[in-house]
Structure formats: structure tokens, C-alpha cells
Amino acid sequence: MEFAHLTVLSLFCLAFVGITATSSGEDYWQSIWPNTPLPKTFSDLSIPSGKTNSLPIKSEELKQYSTLFFEHDLHPRKNFILGNTNSVGSIIRPFTKSRQGVTDSIWLANKEKQSLEDFCYSPTAIAEHKHCVSSLKSMIDQVISHFGSTKIKAISSNFAPYQDQYVVEDVKKVGDNAVMCHRLNFEKVVFNCHQVRDTTAYVVSLVASDGTKTKALTVCHHDTRGMNPELLYEALEVTLGTVPVCHFIGNKAAAWVPNHTADNLCVM
């Protein structure tokens, strides 16, 4: 299956990238999914200029993207601290404070700076297919073409603000080989949609230290050959291609999977 189809699929609900006219994008959305509002997660996508006045991912949100762990850690009563190792924080130094860049850094070489062009035109990692998306209509068309159906759904996280300590309450598998769409941390509204071979997506119910209940989209990669080897070893003391590695997905991203139930198009 072509990744282009996956890409737009994922980005369809999530990456209604406001580079084209907002009204036409929303009209097209409604023509396919009547009475289905765009999720709050995608509020920036309603900006006609396709550009925000500040970076979309704030400093306090970066830990949502920098917590690596093993698949066997996904079980009830497991404790997690977001951004749980000093080594991870030092390895992904371009993303430890809010600056332009890409938050999903486990697939990147370690660089102090990265432009939008650097990322979007860089080679893909092993087992990865990626695409930067800037047109809502083309995304929708490709998603529907890929699945052959409009029955798809986007799943995202809703981490509690200013909370970084959580206990797992429940784990639910939602699908294999999902397409992930990440908002890139640039003022220009662009999403990176990528698929990595041999992945499993979960929704993990969490309870924060203050009692707030939340859900975290989680992805486990069974093929890790394309990951950043330095980060992977420093965080978990494992080498590429040896064991499955998992990570949470922050609030400014979503996974697209087929919708086999009567659920709403976009959830969480």
C-alpha cells in the first residue's frame, strides 16, 4: 500500500493543515462527514493564513514526546514519569525547550537545529514512510482512496496540563500499523504523517498524581532499525532492531486507524 494514501488518511482529521482556505477545507470535510465537527486538537487548522503567531508545542508539553519504554511496561498499576531520564533530555536537546523543530525525534539524527525543509525533504528512516502535508482536500482524497471507505477514525492523547506523573489504569489495543500525524513545531501549520512498519497502537488510560484521569495514545515499534541509536541506547540501554520500543504521543498528534465500530470519526 502506498504511504501517500496512509499519510493523508492520518492527516485527514488531524492534519487539516490550514495552508489552503479554511472555509473550503471545512466544507469539503462536512460534505463527506456531515455534522462531524473538527476536533479541538486541530483548532490551529482553522487559521486562514495557515500560520500561528507562536510555536504550537509549549515547553511543558515536550515531555509528552520524550518518554521511551518497553512494551511489557504497558500494564495496570505501572508508574510513568514523563521525560523519565536525564539522558533522554540531553540527547534530544533540540526539543527540550520550545523552539522550531520536530518533536518525534526518535527517528532523527541528533541536530542542534532543523528547518522545515530539512525535515520534509530528508531521507526516510529504515521501515518508515513519511510525508509532510499542507492540503486538506488532497489528504481527504488519499485517505479515502487508501482505505476504500470513509469509516476511519483519528485517535489522540489528552494529557493533563502541568502533570508528568501517571499510573496506568487500563491498556487497550486499537490497531496495527497505524499512520501517525504529528504537528511540526513551526509557526507554519504543517503535519508530518508517517507510517513505520510493524507497529502497534494502544490507548492507555492514565491517572495523574493529582487524580486527573486522562488517556494517552501510545505506539510500540517492533522494527526499531531506523531509530536514533544514540537516544535509544541512552534511554533504554538497547541497540537497534533488538526489542520493541514504545513511546507516548503528545496532544498535538493523532493516529489514523480503520473504524470498525459505531464510534465517532475522531475520538479522545
Curated annotation (Swiss-Prot):
Organismal lineage: Eukaryota, Viridiplantae, Streptophyta, Embryophyta, Tracheophyta
Organism: Vicia faba
Keywords in alphabetical order: Signal
Keyword Signal on entry: yes
Protein name as it appears in the record: Unknown seed protein 30.1
Signal peptide: 1-22
One of the Pfam families matching this protein, by short name: BURP
Residue ranges occupied by any BURP domain in the UniProt entry: 68-259
